[in-house]
Amino acid sequence: MKKQLLIGSVLLVASSQVWADAASSLKQKLADVSLFSAKFAQTVYDSKGKELQKAGGDLLVQRPNRFNWHTTSPDESLIVADGKDVWVYDPFVEQVTALKLKDAVLNTPFILIAGNDDKFWKHYDVTQEGNVYTVTSRNKDELIASFRVTFDRQNNISRFDVKEAQGQWSEFTLSSFNRKPVLKGNEFVFKIPKGVELDDQR
């Protein structure tokens, strides 16, 4: 019995160390890409692997907590995080929803890419296989079950995958990755267009 307990303890310590090393490695890689722009292609699948939808657009991220997510096809939409609030704009219905950043990211580990707050990491387990990192939520009630980030040989983010708790998942493939995009200064500022309804949930 003592031998079994000892083996169990060793395995637990070893697995904890592996998690810590994987998390530290991922944190460092993300810190090294604190500013980047890219084009994204998204494919959404149901729990059985059937393709549901494709989308594409442009992504701009500046850590901490600033990003501009512009979907251009098949329908246009825009998500802007200014470091404090998140603005979700749907031009088709002429409505924008304003959320507190902490509320908007509650159910998505995407904040780990855009943010740098260590307190978020305690809610996730991290495993690593080469340049692929899988971030799994410890909270079984969250909408997002896991989040996978893949880096290329230049340590640029080449892809990330999001799996929902109910089995549906999305693949995001990044291209035209640029660590030195030229910023005009207003990329992370959202101004409500004239005639657009505001749904303020802050």
Curated annotation (Swiss-Prot):
<keyword id="KW-0143">Chaperone</keyword>
<comment type="function">
    <text>Participates in the translocation of lipoproteins from the inner membrane to the outer membrane. Only forms a complex with a lipoprotein if the residue after the N-terminal Cys is not an aspartate (The Asp acts as a targeting signal to indicate that the lipoprotein should stay in the inner membrane).</text>
</comment>
<dbReference type="GO" id="GO:0044874">
    <property type="term" value="P:lipoprotein localization to outer membrane"/>
</dbReference>
<dbReference type="Pfam" id="PF03548">
    <property type="entry name" value="LolA"/>
</dbReference>
<keyword id="KW-0813">Transport</keyword>
<dbReference type="InterPro" id="IPR029046">
    <property type="entry name" value="LolA/LolB/LppX"/>
</dbReference>
<comment type="similarity">
    <text>Belongs to the LolA family.</text>
</comment>
<comment type="subunit">
    <text>Monomer.</text>
</comment>
<feature type="signal peptide">
    <location>
        <begin position="1"/>
        <end position="20"/>
    </location>
</feature>
<keyword id="KW-0574">Periplasm</keyword>
<dbReference type="InterPro" id="IPR004564">
    <property type="entry name" value="OM_lipoprot_carrier_LolA-like"/>
</dbReference>
<dbReference type="InterPro" id="IPR018323">
    <property type="entry name" value="OM_lipoprot_carrier_LolA_Pbac"/>
</dbReference>
<keyword id="KW-0732">Signal</keyword>
<dbReference type="GO" id="GO:0042953">
    <property type="term" value="P:lipoprotein transport"/>
</dbReference>
<protein>
    <recommendedName>
        <fullName>Outer-membrane lipoprotein carrier protein</fullName>
    </recommendedName>
</protein>
<keyword id="KW-0653">Protein transport</keyword>
<dbReference type="GO" id="GO:0030288">
    <property type="term" value="C:outer membrane-bounded periplasmic space"/>
</dbReference>
